Amino acid sequence: MDLRLFKNIVILTGAGISAESGIRTFRDQDGLWEDHRIEDVATPEAFARNPALVQRFYNLRRAQLRDPNLAPNPAHQALVDLENLWEGNFLLVTQNVDNLHRRAGSKNLLHMHGRLDRVFCLHCDEHFEWLLDLAVDQPCPHCGRKGGVRPDIVWFGEMPHHMEEIYEALDKADYFISIGTSGNVYPAAGFVRLAWKAKKIEINLKDTEISPAFDEHFVGPASTEVPRFITQFLE
């Protein structure tokens, strides 16, 4: 393929790319965590009502990132290879809150739903890298006040991060790839239609509700399909 035909590429990744590395969602088949709805531990109201419960949920999720067996998989690495070889504008947008893309070496990366390895203070709005457990009374490393340090995660009812930059990139994109996304979480599910002039590729375990909006589909695990597609793409 003549890559000179394409100058602006936007790639969207979802839970499917991280699941193969062993990232758990902590939801059972009913969508519950220890009999709690995820919405009950992932809203600003939940944090105000029961901060200990919310912190425990995210401490469990954050502990996964400290697991020595957790590592980026071939799909993450293939995206790094593509970024390094791409001569135009490259943007990787992820819905995932883990650190696997960055550990693999991705540079032009936006976490639209926040980062599990960061926290911020509600009192002073400072953000910090944080991989340890977080206590309810954790003093803010910047202002020293207690009770306001929370996960740097976009909760239900909050605005996803970097949307202006993402929308601008989608409007300019001439190639759009969606990997491992459910196709039913907005605003990300609408990205394929916002990339109005782009060639659109979907890589997923199965078809999604938005599959008809794509030009091509590749069905299978991200760890095999993404490297295969990118190898062919770069030939």
UniProtKB/Swiss-Prot annotation:
The UniProt entry, under PROSITE patterns, shows: SIRTUIN
Cofactor stoichiometry and binding remark: Binds 1 zinc ion per subunit.
Principal localisation: cytoplasm
The compartments listed are: Cytoplasm
The record's section on Gene3D superfamilies has: SIR2/SIRT2 'Small Domain, TPP-binding domain
Q: Name one GO cellular component term.
A: cytoplasm
Provide the residue positions that the database annotates as binding Zn(2+): 121, 124, 140, 143
Cofactor(s) for this protein?
Zn(2+)
Q: Which residues form the active site?
A: 113 (proton acceptor)
Report the EC code(s) recorded for this entry: 2.3.1.286
Question: Per the record, what are the reactions this protein catalyses?
Answer: N(6)-acetyl-L-lysyl-[protein] + NAD(+) + H2O = 2''-O-acetyl-ADP-D-ribose + nicotinamide + L-lysyl-[protein]; N(6)-succinyl-L-lysyl-[protein] + NAD(+) + H2O = 2''-O-succinyl-ADP-D-ribose + nicotinamide + L-lysyl-[protein]
Chain sites annotated for binding substrate: 58, 61
Residue ranges of every copy of the Deacetylase sirtuin-type domain listed in the record: 1-235
Q: GO MF terms on file? A: histone deacetylase activity, NAD-dependent; NAD+ binding; protein-malonyllysine demalonylase activity; protein-succinyllysine desuccinylase activity; zinc ion binding
Q: Organism's domain of life?
A: Bacteria
Q: Name the enzyme group at the top EC level.
A: transferase
- UniProt keyword annotations, A-Z: Cytoplasm, Metal-binding, NAD, Transferase, Zinc
Q: Which SUPFAM superfamilies match?
A: DHS-like NAD/FAD-binding domain
What family, per the record? Belongs to the sirtuin family. Class III subfamily.
Q: What else is known?
A: This protein might be subject to alternative promoter usage and might also encode a protein with a 13 residue-longer N-terminus.
User: What is the stated purpose of this protein?
Assistant: NAD-dependent lysine deacetylase and desuccinylase that specifically removes acetyl and succinyl groups on target proteins. Modulates the activities of several proteins which are inactive in their acylated form.
The Swiss-Prot or TrEMBL note on domains reads: 2 residues (Tyr-58 and Arg-61) present in a large hydrophobic pocket are probably involved in substrate specificity. They are important for desuccinylation activity, but dispensable for deacetylation activity.
UniProt protein name? NAD-dependent protein deacylase
> What would be the name of the gene that encodes this protein?
cobB
